[in-house]
């Protein structure tokens, strides 16, 4: 008699109901980590933001789009059917990430439904982030 495998049962049920949905992604940050950053995984969030900000300061809309597109391609390869991605809007990246996410949303259309949620990473208590 085969041993019961709850993971296999879960996957079977999810697929029978239309497949997986990634409901909390950060596709604008996909593929931005480097091996050098891996030893910083236990650092305080504010320290990690410095590394993230370095990418964001230098990333154009096209850079964000390529990362988002690659992440979605990977999700589709894994049979994920749709996703919600949280995208930064702040004084560092301004509208670059959200613009790229909207382009990706249009690019994939119904092939991969993408919900975009805005994330004001630097907070809304200061005037500049709030205005964005």
Where are the predicted features?
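Histidine-rich, glycine-flanked metal-binding segment
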Residues: 1-17, 117
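Single, functionally critical "micro-switch" positions that shape active/binding sites
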Residues: 21-25, 51-55, 78
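Active-site loop-helix segments enriched in His/Asp/Glu that coordinate
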Residues: 37, 55-132
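Mixed-charge, polar/low-complexity N-terminal
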Residues: 2, 6-8, 50, 62, ...
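Histidine (H) residue identity feature
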Residues: 17, 24-26, 42-44, 107-110
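Active-site gating loops and adjacent loop-to-helix segments of metal-dependent hydrolytic enzymes
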Residues: 30-64
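A near-ubiquitous, low-amplitude feature marking generic local secondary-structure context
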Residues: 10, 15, 47, 51-54, ...
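Di-metal (Zn2+ and/or Mg2+/Mn2+) metal-binding site signature of metallo-dependent hydrolases
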Residues: 13-36
């Amino acid at each position: 008699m085969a041993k019961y495998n709850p993971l296999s049962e879960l996957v079977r049920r999810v697929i029978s109901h239309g497949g997986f949905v990634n409901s909390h992604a950060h596709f604008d940050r996909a593929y931005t980590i480097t091996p050098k950053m891996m030893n910083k995984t236990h650092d305080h969030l504010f320290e990690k933001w410095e590394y993230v900000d370095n990418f964001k300061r230098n990333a154009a809309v096209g850079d964000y789009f390529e990362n988002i597109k690659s992440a979605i391609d990977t999700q589709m390869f894994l049979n994920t059917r749709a996703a919600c991605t949280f995208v930064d809007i702040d004084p560092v990246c301004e509208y670059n990430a959200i613009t790229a996410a909207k382009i990706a949303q249009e690019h994939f259309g119904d092939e991969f439904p993408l919900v975009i949620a805005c994330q004001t990473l630097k907070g809304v208590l200061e005037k500049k982030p709030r205005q964005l």
